[in-house]
Each structure stands twice: as C-alpha cells, then as structure tokens.
C-alpha cells in the first residue's frame, strides 16, 4: 500500500516521500517507506 514519510522517522533520506510500504528493517512500531522513483529514497514512519 501507499505510504507517506515525514521528518519524524529514522533513516530519512528524502522527506516527505510518497511511495509504498516496504517490509524492510525499521524499529518496532514503525514501517518502512520506499520511493517509487528512487531506490535510495526511503524512510521509516510510525504505524
């Protein structure tokens, strides 16, 4: 599903970021967002 990142999350490289939920490594209670357009643009956001 889609997700939008913001500056509050750890590992923010590009924010705000619109992309998809990636089952990557984020802290418990967070989910990873990955950009549709850039493989290096990702961040974690609170669930």
Curated annotation (Swiss-Prot):
Pfam hit, one: Toxin_4
Localisation per UniProt entry: Secreted; Nematocyst
Keywords for the protein's UniProt record, in alphabetical order: Disulfide bond, Ion channel impairing toxin, Nematocyst, Neurotoxin, Secreted, Toxin, Voltage-gated sodium channel impairing toxin
Gene Ontology MF annotations: sodium channel regulator activity; toxin activity
GO biological process, one term: regulation of signal transduction
InterPro entries xrefs: Anenome_toxin (IPR000693), Myo_ane_neurotoxin_sf (IPR023355)
Keyword check for Secreted: yes
Top-level taxon of origin: Eukaryota
Assigned protein family: Belongs to the sea anemone sodium channel inhibitory toxin family. Type II subfamily.
More about this protein: A synonymy between H.magnifica and R.crispa is controversial.
Name this polypeptide is given: Delta-stichotoxin-Hcr1d
Species per Swiss-Prot/TrEMBL record: Radianthus crispa (Leathery sea anemone)
């Amino acid at each position: 599903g889609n997700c939008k990142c913001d500056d509050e999350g750890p590992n923010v490289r590009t924010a705000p970021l619109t992309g998809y939920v990636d089952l990557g490594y984020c802290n418990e209670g967070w989910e990873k967002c990955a950009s549709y357009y850039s493989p290096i643009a990702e961040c974690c956001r609170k669930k």
